[in-house]
A protein has these predicted regions:
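Core structural elements
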Residues: 21-39
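A short, GP-enriched loop/loop-strand-helix hinge that lies immediately N-terminal to
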Residues: 45-50
Length: 242
């Protein structure tokens, strides 16, 4: 059980028991959805979104919340009943609805004001009617961008991504020598690079930021070498290697 290995890292017995109860409740929901899949012989639309949410993204956000709490961090999870990411009805390739999402931000802002860290599952949205939806590939990048858009109306906001690599001057799978680290990119440069194959950041995430008229830095940090950082801004202050 992969989740059990994580739960065992929580030293506080009360938090550990609470976390186990949450995991079991979500997995029970996932089992109900799986039964529907077997009955309908179809893994699509809201059934697909519900299973991905209950067995993965939303469940993991609750587990992360308990891990943070066990480390003494004042944290909370954003529950699905006050989910701030509202999308259209394209259930498997949803589109972010900024105006409708802004109307749902009050509870999330209240949680933020009372805590230091909030956890939320990526990739998942819901319609105005409350039906679960999913973004396409790269959806977690879009979730971060969408939250940045929503929070920027009230807070000074930036987005930090920890990735397998910061941005390089060429595809390291193709070019093996003389690769340079790119420290600065514009929104447009990053979006175009994504459209032509750069996998580090979903270009739709940047497109949504631009379309909503938001200016906030996007920081890409190499997890293995955290000194390697790329900053993406509307008007970058520095140019190198591109």
């Amino acid at each position: 059980k992969p989740y059990q290995k994580i739960v065992n890292m929580i030293e506080d017995k009360v938090l550990q028991d609470d976390c186990n109860r949450i995991i079991n409740s979500f997995l029970e929901k996932a089992e109900v959805v799986l039964a529907e899949v077997l009955q309908k012989r179809e893994f699509a639309n809201e059934t697909r979104a519900r299973l991905l949410a209950y067995s993965g993204e939303i469940l993991m956000s609750h587990v992360m919340n308990y891990i943070l709490k066990s480390s003494g961090i004042k944290s909370e999870v954003i529950p699905f009943d006050v989910w701030p990411i509202i999308t259209d009805n394209n259930l498997e390739s949803a589109n972010f609805l900024a105006s409708e999402s802004s109307e749902k931000m009050a509870e999330t802002e209240k949680l933020l004001e009372n805590n230091d860290v909030l956890s939320i599952g990526g990739f998942i949205g819901k319609t105005v009617e409350g039906i679960e939806t999913t973004y396409e590939r790269g959806g977690s990048d879009r979730t971060a961008a969408d939250l940045g858009i929503l929070f920027s109306k009230k807070y000074h906001t930036r987005i930090d991504f920890e990735k397998d690599s910061a941005v390089l001057s060429a595809d390291p799978r193709v070019v093996k020598e003389e690769l340079e680290s790119i420290t600065s990119l514009s929104y447009n440069e990053a979006r175009i690079a994504g459209m032509f194959g750069m996998k580090i950041l979903d270009p739709i995430a940047i497109k949504e930021i631009v379309e909503n008229g938001v200016e906030m830095p996007i920081i890409i940090t190499d997890m293995g070498r955290p000194e390697k950082i790329t900053t993406i801004e509307r008007k970058p202050s520095e140019k190198n290697g591109h």
